């Protein structure tokens, strides 16, 4: 054959192509495979997780976040690949971590104080480099955090006890407003109105329409959750963004009216000490040139939405757990009778309510609302032996960690899990370190006041067969019940005023 090919007189082009083509195809495939191997070599990682495979891996992992929600996706990847996993969001390397040692390292170091999310999404909801919750500019975040810290501690914390208790009593007296036609109480709406009323009295002090603002807060939260990880192309298609932009605008417009009224009150006040609060401090900072008007407005908005957004759902879950566990309710009621009795609750009662505190902790561990934390690495680092590059996104899967380490009965709801002191590295419902939740202390006090005040007046029941474990939930930016379900109502039974323990 070789001689025929070399000899022009015997050259047969058809025969040559037929015989050489398979060899050439194999050579091309081998060369292509080698080039792909070289191209993808830099994308290999010692960290467990799905493969890169020509960019298909990052595309699939991002789509999974958009489809399943952030929380559900994190649980999927940790369950599939382990407690330290590498995936991608918007093409950026992202770590999903549920190891306590890794979380401890990240939370305590200042080079993890930035968050991450779609820049266009955060701009749409007003959080890009503004406010405190998802402000991913460390310098601007540090500028506003002292205002939150001051408002959420000290005298504000003491005053909150009375303000919150009064708000709960007022709303319980108007319980018919949140009952449906069957007499079941819409606890989520009740708690959201109480939390908004309390936050407004403490931090803004302008009369508002609770019903309307609560609905607008829910629309804003839905937009925030939907837009946080969307790719840039999503925002170029106007009809896709329209409903979210409207939800954001509805709340911002309502808040703008309230904040403008606050500005007017400050400018006409005879004594500034009569209107000094969180909003006033921010407005003064704006007048000094320390903060922009847009940043001030966003900070006030975030302060008012924080409790209705998360704490109201936490208390909702707690009441469902109390209804299912009568022995826990009995222990709580005994402590309330011993510590508080028939008088009004006070700030100095807080440290004595240990059963209530352990119940709150166990509820937040067993059925969390905020079960993940999102951060960004600002420097190169090594975490538990794994290299982490500057700019890497990090999601701390706290909810999963709370069911993996330390607790004697991690998959059960029982106060035995807090019968002994729990090292804080194993239990982080509010985080810790430089970017810990600024409101963690006031949140604990507010939940104690809410439970004590409500349970002294009512015994709570769920509809037959309904419990947290069977409840439909959505686990995205936070974990919420599916509010399209008609199974969320509760029965409030007035207690015997003479005997706190009578049901």
UniProtKB/Swiss-Prot annotation:
GO biological process: female gonad development; lipid metabolic process; response to estradiol
Residues holding substrate: 309, 374
Recorded superkingdom: Eukaryota
Stretches that traverse the bilayer: 19-39, 51-71, 303-323
InterPro entries in the record: Cyt_P450 (IPR001128), Cyt_P450_CS (IPR017972), Cyt_P450_E_grp-I (IPR002401), Cyt_P450_sf (IPR036396), Cytochrome_P450_Monoox (IPR050196)
PROSITE patterns according to UniProt: CYTOCHROME_P450 (PS00086)
Binding-site positions, heme: 437
Membrane topology listed for this record: Multi-pass membrane protein
Enzyme class per UniProt: oxidoreductase
EC number: 1.14.14.14
Localization (cell): Endoplasmic reticulum membrane; Microsome membrane
Gene Ontology, cellular component aspect: endoplasmic reticulum membrane
CDD domains (alphabetical): CYP19A1
Needed cofactors: heme
Biological pathway: Steroid hormone biosynthesis
Reaction catalysis annotation: testosterone + 3 reduced [NADPH--hemoprotein reductase] + 3 O2 = 17beta-estradiol + formate + 3 oxidized [NADPH--hemoprotein reductase] + 4 H2O + 4 H(+); androst-4-ene-3,17-dione + 3 reduced [NADPH--hemoprotein reductase] + 3 O2 = estrone + formate + 3 oxidized [NADPH--hemoprotein reductase] + 4 H2O + 4 H(+); androst-4-ene-3,17-dione + reduced [NADPH--hemoprotein reductase] + O2 = 19-hydroxyandrost-4-ene-3,17-dione + oxidized [NADPH--hemoprotein reductase] + H2O + H(+); 19-hydroxyandrost-4-ene-3,17-dione + reduced [NADPH--hemoprotein reductase] + O2 = 19-oxo-androst-4-ene-3,17-dione + oxidized [NADPH--hemoprotein reductase] + 2 H2O + H(+)
Primary residence: endoplasmic reticulum
GO molecular function, one term: estrogen 2-hydroxylase activity
Keywords, sorted A to Z: Endoplasmic reticulum, Heme, Iron, Lipid metabolism, Membrane, Metal-binding, Microsome, Monooxygenase, Oxidoreductase, Transmembrane, Transmembrane helix
Family statement drawn from the similarity comment of this UniProt entry: Belongs to the cytochrome P450 family.
Function in brief: A cytochrome P450 monooxygenase that catalyzes the conversion of C19 androgens, androst-4-ene-3,17-dione (androstenedione) and testosterone to the C18 estrogens, estrone and estradiol, respectively. Catalyzes three successive oxidations of C19 androgens: two conventional oxidations at C19 yielding 19-hydroxy and 19-oxo/19-aldehyde derivatives, followed by a third oxidative aromatization step that involves C1-beta hydrogen abstraction combined with cleavage of the C10-C19 bond to yield a phenolic A ring and formic acid.
Protein name from the UniProt record: Aromatase
Species of provenance: Leucopleurus acutus (Atlantic white-sided dolphin)
Name of the gene this protein is made from: CYP19A1
């Amino acid at each position: 054959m070789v001689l025929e090919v070399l000899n022009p007189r015997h050259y047969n082009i058809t025969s040559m192509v037929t015989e050489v083509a398979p060899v050439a195809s194999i050579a091309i495939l081998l060369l292509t495979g080698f080039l792909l191997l070289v191209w993808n070599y830099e994308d290999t990682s010692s960290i467990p997780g799905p493969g890169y495979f020509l960019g298909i891996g990052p595309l699939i992992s991002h789509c999974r976040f958009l489809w399943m929600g952030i929380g559900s996706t994190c649980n999927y990847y940790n369950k599939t690949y382990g407690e330290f996993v590498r995936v991608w969001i918007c093409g950026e390397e992202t770590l999903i971590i549920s190891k306590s040692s890794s979380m401890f390292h990240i939370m305590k170091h200042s080079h993890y104080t930035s968050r991450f999310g779609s820049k266009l999404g955060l701009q749409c909801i007003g959080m890009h480099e503004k406010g405190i919750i998802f402000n991913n500019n460390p310098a601007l975040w540090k500028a506003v955090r002292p205002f939150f810290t001051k408002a959420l501690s000290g005298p504000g914390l003491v005053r909150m006890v009375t303000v919150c208790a009064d708000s709960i009593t007022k709303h319980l007296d108007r319980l018919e407003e949140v009952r449906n036609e069957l007499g079941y109480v819409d606890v989520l709406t009740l708690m959201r109105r109480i939390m908004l009323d309390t936050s407004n009295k403490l931090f803004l002090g302008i009369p508002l329409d609770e019903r309307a603002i609560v609905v607008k807060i829910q629309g804003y939260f839905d937009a925030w959750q939907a837009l946080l990880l969307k790719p840039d192309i999503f925002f170029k298609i106007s009809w896709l963004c329209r409903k979210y932009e409207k939800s954001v605008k509805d709340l911002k417009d309502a808040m703008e009216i309230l904040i403008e009224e606050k500005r007017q009150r400050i400018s006409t006040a005879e004594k500034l000490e009569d209107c000094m609060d969180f909003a006033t401090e921010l407005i003064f900072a704006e007048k000094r040139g320390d903060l922009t008007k847009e940043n001030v407005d966003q900070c006030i908005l975030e302060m008012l939405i924080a409790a209705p957004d998360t704490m109201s759902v936490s208390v909702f879950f707690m009441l469902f757990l109390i209804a299912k566990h009568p022995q826990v309710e009995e222990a709580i009621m005994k402590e309330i009778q011993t510590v508080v009795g028939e008088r009004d609750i006070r700030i100095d009662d807080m440290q004595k309510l240990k059963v209530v505190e352990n119940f709150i902790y166990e509820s937040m561990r067993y059925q969390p609302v905020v079960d993940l934390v999102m951060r960004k690495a600002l420097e190169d680092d090594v975490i538990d032996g794994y290299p982490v590059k500057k700019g890497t996104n990090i999601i701390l899967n706290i909810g999963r960690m709370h069911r993996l380490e330390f607790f004697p009965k991690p998959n059960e709801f029982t106060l035995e899990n807090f019968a002994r002191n729990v090292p804080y590295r194993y239990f982080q419902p509010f985080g810790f370190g430089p970017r810990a939740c600024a409101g963690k202390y006031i949140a604990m006090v507010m939940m104690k006041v809410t439970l004590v005040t409500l349970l002294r007046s009512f015994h709570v029941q769920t509809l037959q067969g309904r419990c947290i474990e069977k409840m439909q939930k959505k686990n995205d930016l936070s974990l919420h019940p599916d509010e399209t379900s008609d199974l969320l109502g509760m029965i409030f039974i007035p207690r015997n005023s003479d005997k706190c323990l009578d049901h």
